[in-house]
């Protein structure tokens, strides 16, 4: 470290997130206590209480009038940085544990590298049960030329030297939306900016990949399909060497968008074309195997679905054992999460469906335990929930089906989510009510009633199931008569 110069400059981009900003700042304190650091905050907030909070942690607070350009805001902090290294973070992120970052610098290992990556854990629900992990490059050795580029999805360039993966986790809540309007607002902010940048630099693959991600996240399936088809035929893209690892994003976006539009046969055809392409990376192939399995599950082709999932898991070790190569393949968005928690839940859920359909009781129970039965199962792939409910009706006599019914009932939020995602199959269950009652499937009757009755009322009836059965019949008949 040069005399009087900080080893690390930390730059925080602050907004009006008063509920998360202190947690972010507190997570930086161990780094600031153990390393020669400076903390620079670029303050885009409009709330006086945010400014007051920031001053508790640093006197380097720079006001910035928001202009819809993330790079301009970031460069405002970068221009003030005096450190040898630079780390940037947002106010909806916080380090779970910064020990590995501290060790990287205190050990002197940083001398051998030009940049470092750590894991960003993106949460998708308020309970922090559903998330994806992605390597992000947020720490660099400063040089005279480096600047943030891009109005959105900004990045530092140029960066020199080799990179180091540091096993530190920064949690991120920016993808948790209180309302659909909030999620839509983000989409409507990002997409015009990306299209504007693509118009300025039409050969820049980075923006095309990010636009695929935006369409995917917003579930704009028709736009996603159209854009991916065009991108895969773009001659300028095809001629770029980087296309060999990034094309997987376009293949994945195309297949998933077709699946989501209920065209399983066509999606399976697109998978076969994609995996035979020289531009589809091994990680892309693994992701497409998972989508192929889902397509077969929707067609009730259980043996084929199971075979795809077995191949998906067989490829995992081969793909992930070389961390450096794996990180390169993960530059392709969407497929970067091929082996994250959500996609593995999808894979286990497909296997559960296959084994439930084939009455493999022991396998169903084993897979049921792997899934950690809660609302994250529904989030993993809501399209599979109706199939699960259908199979639970068809195979209601089995012990494994009873176990799953019980778990759904015991977890009210999971039950509510399944009802919301799968209404037509709850109605199908209602149609089969007399079968439930005749066979005396007590747990299924309880689930059926939960469609219409408050749990606190139902709990009082658990010891008098015959009475519940009569109430179920009368209640559902009454509701159905009201619909006529």
Kindly label every feature range from the protein language model.
Residues 223-233, 264-276, 302-315, 360-373, ...:
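Alpha-helical repeat scaffolds
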Residues 26-36:
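Short, acidic, metal-binding catalytic loop of nucleotide-sugar glycosyltransferases
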Residues 65-81:
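Glycine-rich, basic loop-to-helix element that forms the pyrophosphate-binding segment
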Residues 27, 39-54, 66, 90-94:
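A conserved acidic beta->alpha catalytic loop
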Residues 7-9, 38:
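Cell-envelope/extracellular polymer assembly enzymes that use nucleotide-activated donors
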Residues 197-201, 233-247, 276-283, 317-341, ...:
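Flexible helix-coil transition and linker loops at the boundaries of alpha-helical arrays
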Residues 86:
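Short aromatic/hydrophobic "clamp" motif used to bind/position activated sugar donors
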Residues 75, 95-223:
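Catalytic-site signature of metal-activated, phosphate-bearing donor transferases
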């Amino acid at each position: 470290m040069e005399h009087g110069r900080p080893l690390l400059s930390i730059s925080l981009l602050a907004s009006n997130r008063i509920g998360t900003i202190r947690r972010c700042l507190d997570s930086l304190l161990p780094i600031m206590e153990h390393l020669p650091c400076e903390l620079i905050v670029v303050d885009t907030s409009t709330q006086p209480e945010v400014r007051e909070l920031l001053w508790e942690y640093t006197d380097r607070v720079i006001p910035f009038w928001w202009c819809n350009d993330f790079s301009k805001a970031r460069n405002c902090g970068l221009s003030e940085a005096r450190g040898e290294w630079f780390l940037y973070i947002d106010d909806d992120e916080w380090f779970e544990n910064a020990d590995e970052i501290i060790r990287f610098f205190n050990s002197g290992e940083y001398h051998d590298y030009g940049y470092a990556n750590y894991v960003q854990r993106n949460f998708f629900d308020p309970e922090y049960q559903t998330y994806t992990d992605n390597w992000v490059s947020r720490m660099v050795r400063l040089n005279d030329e480096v600047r943030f580029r891009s109005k959105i999805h900004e990045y530092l360039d140029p960066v020199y030297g080799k990179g180091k993966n540091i096993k530190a986790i920064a949690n991120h809540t920016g993808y948790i939306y209180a309302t659909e309007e909030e999620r839509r607002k983000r989409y409507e902010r990002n997409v015009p900016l990306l299209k504007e940048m693509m118009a300025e630099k039409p050969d820049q693959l980075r923006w095309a990949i990010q636009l695929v991600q935006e369409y995917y996240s917003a579930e704009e399936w028709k736009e996603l399909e159209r854009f991916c088809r065009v991108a895969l035929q773009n001659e300028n893209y095809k001629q770029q060497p980087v296309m060999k690892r990034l094309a997987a994003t376009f293949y994945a976006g195309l297949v998933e968008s077709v699946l989501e539009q209920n065209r399983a046969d066509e999606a399976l055809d697109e998978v076969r074309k994609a995996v035979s392409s020289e531009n589809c990376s091994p990680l892309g192939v693994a992701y497409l195997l998972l989508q192929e399995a889902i397509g077969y599950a929707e067609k009730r082709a259980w043996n084929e679905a199971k075979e795809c999932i077995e191949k998906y898991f067989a490829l995992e070790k081969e793909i992930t054992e070389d961390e450096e190569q794996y990180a390169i393949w993960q530059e392709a968005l969407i497929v970067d999460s091929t082996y994250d928690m959500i996609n593995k839940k999808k894979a286990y859920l497909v296997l559960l469906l296959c084994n439930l359909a084939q009455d493999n009781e022991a396998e169903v129970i084993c897979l049921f335990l792997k899934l950690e039965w809660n609302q994250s199962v529904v989030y993993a792939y809501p399209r599979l929930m109706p199939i699960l409910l259908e199979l639970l009706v068809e195979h209601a006599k089995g012990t494994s089906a009873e176990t799953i019914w019980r778990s759904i009932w015991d977890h009210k939020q999971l039950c509510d989510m399944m009802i919301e995602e799968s209404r037509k199959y709850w109605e199908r269950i209602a149609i089969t009510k007399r079968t439930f009652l005749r066979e005396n499937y007590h747990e299924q009757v309880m689930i059926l009633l939960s469609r219409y009755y408050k749990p606190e009322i139902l709990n009082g009836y658990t010891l008098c199931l015959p009475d519940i059965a009569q109430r179920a019949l009368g209640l559902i008949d009454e509701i159905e008569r009201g619909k006529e």
